[in-house]
From Swiss-Prot:
GO cellular component term of the entry, any: pilus
Ranges that cross the membrane: none
Superkingdom classification of source: Bacteria
Protein name as annotated: Minor fimbrium subunit Mfa5
Alphabetically ordered keywords of this record: Fimbrium, Signal, Virulence
Ranges for domain VWFA: 144-267
Organism: Porphyromonas gingivalis (strain ATCC 33277 / DSM 20709 / CIP 103683 / JCM 12257 / NCTC 11834 / 2561)
Compartments where located: Fimbrium
Keyword Signal: yes
Length: 1228
């Protein structure tokens, strides 16, 4: 029982001893959780040639994690960790579970903005350098570090870059560990170098400059006494009272020296371990393969060494400290010339024994580890040299304290070691959101922007969309400062256009009560004890803007002052309008301002500081030669404008509006007066619809217009204002139309005016005003063409008269404009007798607007010239006094002249009073012998001679005129009362046209064009050998057979002409235009002017396509069906008058059989074969309409003409059932 207790007590004491050792050796441990990467695997048979260390070959490697003959774990060479990657530490069981954490290193953050000092930043004087600073305090436990640096000969010569990098990296490490030099708290550094012997360069110190000086003095010397360097470091560390003790060993190859082993025996050596990665196995295999490169002799004997076999043994790495002879710290078992990886010991026979300096260094490191020192090793520029790398890995405290490095990244290795020793912050991330209204200099894209900022350590990314800076700080050492500095500018336009709040509680400035430079800046970090997600908020600096700008914008507006784009599209604001000239800046006089644009602001007040700002020029000439004039429009800045700015509203904007100086100039070769030619306009563009038209003058453009401006005939124009102070005219050409929406400005009325053109064959130009009230005094010249003359071959009544009205308010008649002698008469309704009295008729002294006149000329050829009426244009509604004088002839017949420069709309433009028939009577210019067919042919279109009645409601239908052109006259009839007022509406005026079928052409032979017919209608033409007439009949159930005002037009009879008219069922009314409820029983009257044959031609609307319309000849007692385009011929004698025909309509009538009348020729005769059940009549005409023969053909019979001369003939067939009645026949 006692024995059992003794055993338990022994185990307990052993546990306590181990526990106590762990506490003493490593009282505190601080670790960073960082990913452990592995380097790329290398080829197993690659040849390794480290400089000055001999040619070593990596043998076949067999991976084995634990040596069978060693107590140390060996990792394969392909798991060597690069210097720039920092792995996780793994705490021991006791440190993990039983040790208390040390006090956390304190961390503080700060943020401040410093105005950019003079000279001012040229981009923007509202600039600040913003700095975020993270400050770590001193470590909370003392730390001592001994740096052991290899200065062997392999660091020099062709490898001098190694030494240079080591010197630079060593100094960097010193400065990182001692950032405040002598003032650094808690950290000291000692310095040892080694070659064939160790050198104590410095004991523990904080003197950064002294340590750097010693490092810079390193010089390559032969030999590599790694054990000596570690022993020297142990000796220095023995004086340390720090809690954390660290040795940093840097070597570029194999150890070649070691201390002598006292009382050496074969037990002090060890054979192969069976782990191909173990340095023991690697060195034996290398010596077997290349013995002369690996083996040197012991200096105590000159014997030539024997070379190893697989049974050979090398010096152990776990000898007790007492076995080494430290009596002379510079002592060694090798000497120059025979140093090597293995040193032959001749005192022991086969299997041969060798000292192994790398194992001696590992052994020496273990003594330091046993004392609680942490050893960091750096394999410097070793590449894949497995023997050297694995030796240094075993020298380190563990594999996580071993680093590989090259001259290029040696500094990173030292940095990683510094971070394990002297952590203030393990990992940190700062997010900083730049405030609205501020822009970071140079940051225009998202991504890594570290190179664009001033960053002490770590990396910075920027997100353009959120204006977020993310600063990944990495590890920050204790007693250090990490900073990032970036420059911000005030975004003046954003601040101007957005209500950015000010920070009234900030106490750090630089301008208290100003704008925040950021919305939030926060540090999230892992502290020195590994506690993550720690957070600190940075303060928010506030600034005020010291400088503002006033921008002057020069933008385009249209004629209405609306902002527009270059193509004329209207936009919603001046800021969207087309820019005529690049913006510039207003700079007031006085001190403190910065050329060329920065205005010094008063930071003591938020009130606006106002400046009187003019445009640079009132006329702008662009690169294409166009000129623009300054104008003031709603919303634009006047000249000058008062613009205010302040530190809160720093960007003033003046928007100066300009209109294109697009004057009419003219003069383009062969197109000098054409409106739509761009080169005729100074702005090289044709004015858009509704824009002003202004003529160039010396005053407004520097040179005047050189040609008249003609309104194009095929492109009606609408303009705004017409401004003409030149000596050129705006010409409204024949058949053209100009509408003026604005006003006419003419400060030079004697020259340069409006001219409205007329001619014989084209309608007078049309000039209309959209705002009549603003254009009551517009002057102009209107041309008038007279067709009246002395016609020598026109029959008994030779003199041709034209009825007209003057086109201005009043005027004398311009008798000198056309040759010959004019006779001008005025229609006087109250006069009893010949109502045509010489004009002007008293009390008038001049011709007056809207009065009716007639004119003829004694010349005996049709006139070609025009008269020019000059005066004030009539631009208003007309209120005309009509009279109906009792006891006179033609009582109530009032003749009115159209004095407008547009056509009067018969249906919409005349307000008929109740006393007046709603019918206008148009007189077609000509003699009393005109409007007839002479010898079967149609006379010229200008010959006319009788009135045409046009009821208001049927105007425009079936070739009835719909308008009364300018300067034409018309007659209206009062039915009752003594006087009344008739109104003509100006805003209903239409475009002038030729008289719509009112010049004689409506009485055309066999008319096939019935015009538009919105109502059921029948148009009948009567054609005689010497005269013709036309009758219009419209049906509507609401009308009567009597007079319907506005629907019926009475016939004004003329002697000596054939007359066709509808007869009223009561009274003696005769209608040229008849509106009736239906066609049934409507009587048609006919007055014959001569004995002879007459033909009726019919134009029937589609409304009567169903059923049948019939014409009964009351004189002959025959009935014929009327079809569209059909005809009926009859005989009449001079003096015949009254009812001749009766119409009827049977809606249910259906044609009983197909019409079958054949027309052919036999020799020179025309043969008619009637195969239908009705008799038919055949009329044979020449092609120019002259009736030759009339044949009656009975049912089932034939009839033939007399022989005819060769040529073409037209045969018109008439029967009650005929639907297709016109045939063309050629006799040959």
């Amino acid at each position: 029982m006692m024995k059992r207790y003794t055993i338990i007590l022994a185990v307990f004491l052993l546990f306590c001893t181990v526990f106590t050792f762990q506490i003493k050796a490593r009282p505190y441990e601080r670790f960073a959780d960082v990913e452990k990467p592995w380097i790329q695997k290398h080829s197993m048979d690659s040849k390794l040639v480290p400089a000055n260390k001999g040619n070593l070959i990596q043998a076949e490697i067999v991976y084995q994690s634990v040596s069978e003959h060693s107590d140390l774990v060996i990792s394969p060479v392909n798991e060597i960790r690069p210097a720039n990657r920092f792995p996780s530490h793994r705490k021991s069981f006791f440190a993990e579970n039983l040790r208390a954490s040390p006090p956390v290193v304190p961390v503080a953050v700060d943020k401040y903005a410093v105005p950019v000092a003079n000279p001012m930043d040229p981009e923007n004087p509202n600039a600040w350098d913003v700095t975020l600073k993270i400050t770590t305090k001193a470590v909370t436990v003392p730390v001592d570090v001994v740096m052991v640096i290899d200065q062997s000969s392999s660091m020099g010569g062709q490898n001098i870059a190694r030494l240079k990098s080591a010197i630079a990296s060593g100094q960097r490490f010193v400065k990182k560990m001692l950032p405040k030099g002598m003032a650094t708290e808690g950290v000291r550094i000692a310095l040892v170098s080694y070659d064939h012997e160790p050198h104590r360069l410095s004991d523990f110190t904080k003197d950064t400059a002294f340590l750097c000086q010693k490092i810079r003095a390193l010089t390559p010397i032969w030999g590599t006494h790694t054990q000596g360097g570690l022993k020297m470091a142990r000796n220095i560390m023995a004086t340390s009272t720090a809690v954390d003790k660290h040795i940093i060993l840097m070597s570029d190859g194999l150890a070649t020296e070691q201390y002598p082993v006292k009382n050496v025996t074969t037990a002090d050596f060890i054979g192969e371990t069976g782990n191909a990665n173990d340095p023991i196995d690697l060195v034996i295999q290398g010596a077997i393969n290349f013995p002369t490169n690996y083996v040197s002799n012991n200096p105590s004997t000159p014997l030539t060494p024997n070379y190893p076999t697989h049974s050979s043994k090398v010096g152990r790495r776990n000898l007790p400290e007492s076995k080494f002879d430290y009596s002379n710290l510079s002592a060694r078992i090798t000497f120059d010339g025979v140093a090597g990886a293995l040193v032959y010991e001749p005192r022991f026979p086969h299997p041969y024994y060798y000292y192994f300096p790398c194992n001696a260094a590992i052994n020496e490191a273990q003594f330091a580890k046993n004392s609680g020192y942490t050893i960091h090793t750096i394999g410097y520029d070793l590449g894949d040299f497995a023997l050297a790398n694995n030796s240094l890995k075993l020298t380190a405290t563990d594999e996580n304290h071993f680093f590989t490095a090259t001259p290029a990244n040696l500094a990173a290795a030292f940095d990683n070691i510094a971070q394990t020793i002297n952590i203030g912050i393990q990992r940190g991330e700062v997010t900083d959101f730049v405030a609205p209204g501020f822009i970071v200099k140079n940051l225009t894209q998202s991504g890594d922007v570290t190179h664009l900022l001033n960053v002490s350590n770590g990396t910075v990314h920027y997100d353009v969309s959120t204006k977020k800076l993310t600063w990944t700080t990495g590890t920050i050492l204790s007693s250090s400062e990490a900073t990032i500095t970036y420059r911000i500018y005030a975004d003046l336009d954003y601040i101007q256009n957005n209500d950015i709040p000010v920070n009234t509680t900030s106490a750090i400035g630089p301008d208290l009560g100003g704008f925040d430079t950021n919305t939030e800046a926060k540090l999230t970090y892992t502290n020195s004890n590994g506690e993550s997600n720690q957070q600190l908020i940075f303060p928010r600096p506030t600034v005020k803007l010291g400088y503002g700008v006033i921008k002057r914008h020069y933008v385009l507006v249209n004629k209405d002052g609306q902002p527009i784009q270059a193509n004329g599209t209207v936009v919603s604001s001046l800021s969207e309008a087309h820019v005529l000239q690049s913006q510039d800046f207003f700079l007031p006089s006085g001190g403190g301002h910065i050329v060329p644009k920065w205005i010094k602001l008063d930071k003591t007040t938020e009130a606006l500081q106002y400046y009187s700002v003019p445009p640079t020029n009132t006329v702008i000439t662009t690169a294409d030669g166009k000129r623009y004039r300054f104008v003031e429009v709603p919303g634009s800045t006047p000249n000058p404008g008062q613009i205010g700015i302040s530190w809160k509203k720093p960007a003033g904007n003046a928007y100066f509006a300009y209109k294109l100086l697009n004057y009419w100039m003219g003069g383009t070769t062969d197109q000098q007066s054409e409106w739509d030619v761009t080169s005729n306009w100074t702005g090289a563009q044709v004015p858009l619809t509704g824009e002003d038209v202004e003529f160039a003058t010396t005053e407004n453009f520097g040179s005047p217009a050189v040609a008249d401006l003609h309104v194009p005939t095929t492109n009606p124009k609408i303009i705004g204002n017409l401004i003409n102070n030149s000596d050129k005219d705006l010409v409204v050409t024949t058949n053209s139309q100009l509408t003026i929406n604005g006003v006419v400005e003419d400060n030079n009325p004697n020259v340069g005016t409006i001219v409205v053109k007329s001619s014989k064959d084209n309608p007078t130009g049309t000039l209309l005003f959209a705002n009549p009230g603003y254009n009551q005094n517009v002057g102009g010249t209107v041309e008038f063409y007279n067709q009246g003359y002395d016609c020598a071959d026109c029959g008994m009544y030779r003199r041709s008269w034209q009825y007209f009205g003057i086109p201005v308010n009043e005027s004398g008649f311009p008798i000198n404009d056309v040759g010959g002698n004019e006779t001008v008469n005025q229609w006087v309704e109250p006069f009893n007798g010949d109502k045509w009295r010489p004009a002007p008729y008293a009390p008038d002294t001049k011709l007056q607007k809207f009065k009716g006149y007639q004119i003829t000329n004694d010349v005996q050829a049709q006139p070609t010239g025009v008269y020019s009426f000059k005066g004030t244009l009539c631009v208003c509604d007309a209120f005309l006094n009509l009279t109906r004088t009792s006891g006179v002839n033609y009582s109530g017949a009032n003749l009115i002249g159209n004095s407008y420069t547009g056509a009067i709309d018969i249906k919409q433009g005349i307000v008929f009073p109740p006393e007046v028939e709603q019918t206008v009577y148009l007189f077609n210019t000509g003699t009393r012998d005109q409007w007839r067919k002479l010898n079967g042919s149609t006379v010229s279109g200008f010959r006319a001679g009788q009135y045409l009645s046009v009821p208001k409601n049927t105007a425009g239908q079936d070739n009835l005129p719909d308008r009364i052109p300018s300067m034409h006259s018309f007659l209206v009839k009062m039915q009752n009362g003594a006087s009344c007022t008739l109104q003509i509406l100006y805003d209903k005026l239409l475009k002038n046209t030729t008289v719509n079928n009112g010049n004689g052409t409506q009485i055309t032979w066999r008319s096939g064009n019935s015009g538009s017919a919105n109502m059921p209608s029948l148009v009948m033409d009567v054609l005689g050998n010497e005269s013709a007439d036309r009758l219009w009949i419209f049906t509507d159930g609401g009308l009567s057979f009597g007079f319907d005002n506005g629907w019926d037009g009475r016939k004004l009879t003329e002697k000596g002409l054939s007359q066709l008219y509808a007869m009223s069922d009561i009274g003696n009314d005769k209608f040229q235009v008849a509106g009736v409820p239906e066609l049934n029983n409507l009587l048609i009257g006919f007055d014959a002017d001569k004995d002879g044959q007459y033909t009726l031609e019919f134009a029937l609307s589609d409304h009567f396509a169903k059923g049948g319309v019939f014409l009964e000849d009351l004189s002959r007692g025959v009935t014929r069906r009327i079809v569209d385009g059909g005809s009926y011929s009859f005989d009449a004698k001079r003096g015949d008058s009254g009812a001749r025909f009766r119409l009827s309509y049977d809606e249910e009538w259906v044609e009983s059989a197909e019409v079958s009348v054949l027309v052919g020729t036999v020799g020179k005769r025309i043969l008619i074969t009637n195969n239908c059940e009705h008799a038919c009549q055949a009329n044979v005409y020449t092609t120019d309409g002259k009736l030759l023969i009339r044949l009656d053909v009975k049912p089932g019979s034939k009839s033939m003409t007399e022989p005819l001369i060769d040529g073409a003939y037209v045969v018109s067939l008439q029967s009650p059932a005929t639907s297709s009645n016109v045939r063309k026949v050629v006799v040959n």
